[in-house]
Amino acid sequence: MRIYNTATRQVEEFTTYTPGLARGYVCGITPYDHVHVGHGRVYVFFDMFRRYLESLGYEVRLVVNFTDIDDKIIAKAREEFGPEAYKRWREVPERYIAEFFEVSKRLFIKPAYAYPRVTENVDDMVKWISALVEKGFAYVAPDGSVYFEVGKVPNYGVLSRQRIEELIAGARVEPEPGKRNPLDFALWKSWSPGEPWWNSPWCPGRPGWHLECVVMSTKHLGVPFDFHGGGADLIFPHHENEIAIAKAYFGVDNFAKYWIHVGYLTVRGEKMSKSLGNVITLREVLSKYSGEALRLAYAMSHYRKPMEFSFELLDQAEDIVKTLYTAYDELSQAVADAGDADRERVDIGNFKAAFYSALEDDFSTPEAVQQLYAAAKYIISTVLHKVDKLSKNTVLAILADYVKMADVIGVLERREVAKEVEEAVKALVEVRARLRSERLYQLADYVRERAKALGAELHDFGPRTYYTIRRRG
């Protein structure tokens, strides 16, 4: 496959350092508030990317961190707990990390290889800072804070394509007290009264954001690893500064081979932000729509482009999900009606080939979704009408190809339905079949309505009837 690499500004052939193993790191949330649909877009994209690689036979080690101590967390704790904040601040990240896992499960995001937390890795971060000071890339300020000296790193700005001289000129501010340069950034922040703190050789305090991710990613994945990702808003300064730290610490130009970034999410043409009051939480969306519909809505936009979020888009996606399930349910039932030999040639190989071709081209999920949807409609309009002319092996092969495509996008995840509901629907289908054979159509229509009350829709294909059961949640 070929993927766009922000580091080179080119679509490149994707290869891994170790054949058959893909190691990746995605910057996780700072858990100080509700997880929103912008977050969801990033983590669903990398879940699809992971599923695609797994479908090609890769083992994928995907690491997602939690920045569980930060200025925003401290501010939230003070807002909620007042003078008790210094004791109770951990309640804030714990609450929103739990919410992250809750919505991830409802979005069918597969568990990561590891979920490191900043607070569990402070000792490692202190060791890194000591090494950077010793190497001459960092310095200690009078208050005990430690800053990374950007000017000591060759080619700073390589990821964001910015020159250090232009960045300094653009800053238009005097350096903060203790800083040598306005672009220098904190590796260690000195403690202030009422804040959480950890011991260090310089002063009580806590690690800086940019250091945290590079320490945790390389700890779990080694150096170099295959891909590093996140939202496009992290390119500068966060990812730029990660590269600078790793370059100073390891002496490597780039500690990750591919840098993959997901575009902004907009609402009515404006970037989603708290200041505009247009933030939409994942809990809100998932209270009204299925996780599969939201996944599909994300996939209907190319990952690198801005995505305009709307509930109309989710309505459209939910309708597509319904069609995908109809094709799956009814084709699954049709296996029993297939014969021993093929009397016609029918398959969905062309849809599957086009699906994978789209993903091979910079992960074009909009085209892949079109192919999956086209395959579903072909199954309903053509395959189900010809089941009696196909062998069981052929029908099973079509079903397997269809499910393989759906699994990459992360839909048809609710294939299992309540056994008692399915048995009740099957019984109604059998009763209705007898009524139709006896031409008691009014009674047959009544039975159809009873099935509908159970959440099932019945579709007739000549003498055969197949059903699909509506999924909830």
Swiss-Prot record:
Subcellular locations according to the entry: Cytoplasm
Any one of the GO CC terms: cytoplasm
Catalytic class of the enzyme: ligase
Motif, 'KMSKS' region: chain positions: 271-275
Stretches of the chain forming a coiled coil according to its record: none
Gene Ontology terms for molecular function: ATP binding; cysteine-tRNA ligase activity; zinc ion binding
Family: Belongs to the class-I aminoacyl-tRNA synthetase family.
Entries under HAMAP family matching the protein: Cys_tRNA_synth
Protein name stated in the entry: Cysteine--tRNA ligase
